[in-house]
UniProtKB/Swiss-Prot annotation:
One of its GO terms (biological process) is negative regulation of transcription by RNA polymerase II. Residues 335-350 have a biased composition (Polar residues). WD repeats lie at residues 12-56, 57-96, 98-137, 141-179, 180-212, 221-262, 263-302. Belongs to the WD repeat STRAP family. The gene is STRAP. It comes from Gallus gallus. The keyword Cytoplasm applies. GO terms for molecular function: mRNA binding; RNA binding; signaling receptor binding; U2 snRNP binding. This is Serine-threonine kinase receptor-associated protein. It comes from the Eukaryota. Residues 311-350 are annotated as: Disordered. It is found in: Cytoplasm; Nucleus. SUPFAM superfamilies: WD40 repeat-like. Its main location: cytoplasm.
Length: 350
């Protein structure tokens, strides 16, 4: 029988966590960046949640954060009317890009040479990072503040969302190709390169659209208002979180709810799958990030599954070893409905 989820809690932020993003898989693993209203985006090891560093320099809430594919650069969008580009290895601030209003979204091209931004001034800006002093290319057409702006996988198109509209733009002509109107305010948007799928959430709806045409593929209705959703890299399942503090996991093909569980102590603002699909991260109003296993009970990262030899699971104990010298023996808890045992995971202190 199924074992319960045991999330790894990553503390360190002092205000709500509003955005997060993973890098691609690098020779050193993959990495996770989080944006927070405390104005201090943080970088972590993606599979363990271990804190690596904090990017210091913004003077207001940070609304958006991203990493390039090889995790050498980070970009952040903030309420101080700036977007910043950082050296993700040293933590140094490389470029500050001034805007005329709050910046909500940032995204690198595949080669990391250009940065796309969007925010409250309703304009998309494209910066050539080799010429940061040059004026950016500006794309206008949104009628309200931009919540999310993303490149397509070939960087030839741009996808952006404002209040109740998602727009598709041609990069070469800087013109709108198509607009998609939805019934309620868009709360999140994710681009999935495999299959060119756009995941959009609004109200209780989780909708999947072609990123090339904006035609709807399918949609699911959740029991509560959803703030964010993420599709597994292999499109097996999806996760979503929202106002009821719960995470929901669905079968992508059938729409069947596979799991639902609480772990946060406030509304969930953002969820994302890791690039290998083994875990997903969630960020909440409670100021924490939590990492969850896609396959509960699998040994991965800091999770270690031990199946007891004896039938009495309550007597079973196990051991989780943390990276480096930080070993900590922690109590094992038996699943209420299973003889298997799962590890409770230690809180990672930033």
């Amino acid at each position: 029988m199924a074992m319960r989820q045991t999330p790894l809690t990553c503390s360190g932020h002092t205000r709500p966590v509003v955005d997060l993003a993973f890098s691609g898989v690098t020779p050193y693993g993959y990495f996770l960046i989080s944006a927070c209203k405390d104005g201090k985006p943080m970088l972590r090891q993606g599979d363990t949640g271990d804190w690596i560093g904090t990017f210091l320099g913004h003077k207001g809430a940070v609304w958006g954060a991203t990493l390039n594919k090889d995790a050498t650069k980070a970009a952040t969008a903030a309420a101080d009317f700036t977007a910043k580009v950082w050296d993700a290895v040293s933590g140094d601030e490389l470029i500050t890009l001034a805007h005329k209003h709050i910046v909500k979204s940032v995204d690198f091209t595949q080669d990391s040479n250009y940065l796309l931004t969007g925010g409250q001034d309703k304009l998309l800006r494209i910066y050539d990072l080799s010429k940061p002093e040059a004026e950016p290319d500006v794309v206008s057409g949104h009628t309200s503040g931009i919540k999310k702006a993303l490149w397509s996988s070939d960087d030839k198109q741009i996808l952006s969302a404002d209040d109740k509209t998602v727009r598709l733009w041609d990069r070469s002509t800087m013109t709108e190709v198509k607009a998609l109107n939805v019934a309620m305010s868009v709360s999140s948007m994710e681009y999935v390169p495999e299959g060119q799928i756009l995941v959009i959430t609004y109200g209780k709806t989780i909708a999947f659209h072609s990123a090339e045409t904006l035609e709807q593929i399918k949609s699911f209705e959740a029991p509560a208002t959803i703030n964010s959703a993420s599709l597994h890299p292999e499109k097996e399942c999806l996760v979503a979180g929202g106002e009821d503090f719960k995470l929901y996991k669905y079968d992508y093909n059938t729409g069947e709810e596979l799991e639902s569980y609480k772990g946060h102590f406030g509304p969930i603002h953002c969820v994302r799958f890791s690039p290998d699909g083994e875990l997903y991260a969630s960020g909440s109003e409670d100021g924490t990030l939590r990492l969850w296993q896609t396959t509960v009970g699998k040994t991965y990262g800091l999770w270690k599954c031990v199946v007891p030899e004896e039938e009495n699971a309550e007597a079973a104990k196990a051991r989780t070893t943390l990276p480096g010298t930080a070993e900590e023996e922690i109590e094992e808890v038996a699943s209420e409905n299973s003889d298997s045992v799962y590890s409770s995971t230690p809180e990672v202190k930033a």
